[in-house]
Amino acid sequence: MVFAAWYLKFAGFVALIFSIIGGSMASSLVLPHASELKGVWQLSDKHQQCDVLLTDHPLPEGSIWSLNGDNDCLAYMFGEVPAGWRPTPDGLTITDEQGSGLAFFAHEPDGWFARFADGRELMIKPNKTSKKNE
């Protein structure tokens, strides 16, 4: 009986701690909507730059938004032409048509960066000179 009472108190304490920790972690990062990030962005590496249009038009997959741009430049940057993108709480992911990630761009103080195992680094940033609704 004493063990059962102690166990219930301990389980309640653990549940309280997890709810506090989980609640603060969940509220620290916000998932932006596609409409907040849509528009023309500049994608670049050390050799090339191209404009990419992030839209708020969903692909048939449902959780991915369409992406448009210069197919030759995009194929050079990603190894294939990406079809879409999706926002994440700490960046954005460029995807193929099925939603598989081709690159994750982490939102850092100096910009949005994707780093690859082969040492390549891509940067993407909003094009401030273009209209949001293009």
Swiss-Prot record:
Gene3D superfamilies documented for this protein: 2.40.128.10
Disulphide bridges, residue numbers: C50-C73
Main subcellular location of this protein, as a coarse class: periplasm
Taxonomic superkingdom: Bacteria
Keywords recorded for this protein, A-Z: Disulfide bond, Metalloenzyme inhibitor, Metalloprotease inhibitor, Periplasm, Protease inhibitor, Signal
MF-aspect GO terms: metalloendopeptidase inhibitor activity
Subcellular location: Periplasm
Family matches, as Pfam families: Inh
One Gene Ontology cellular component annotation held by this UniProt entry: periplasmic space
Signal sequence coordinates: 1-26
Family of the protein in this entry: Belongs to the protease inhibitor I38 family.
Functional note: Inhibitor of the alkaline protease.
Name this protein carries in UniProt: Alkaline proteinase inhibitor
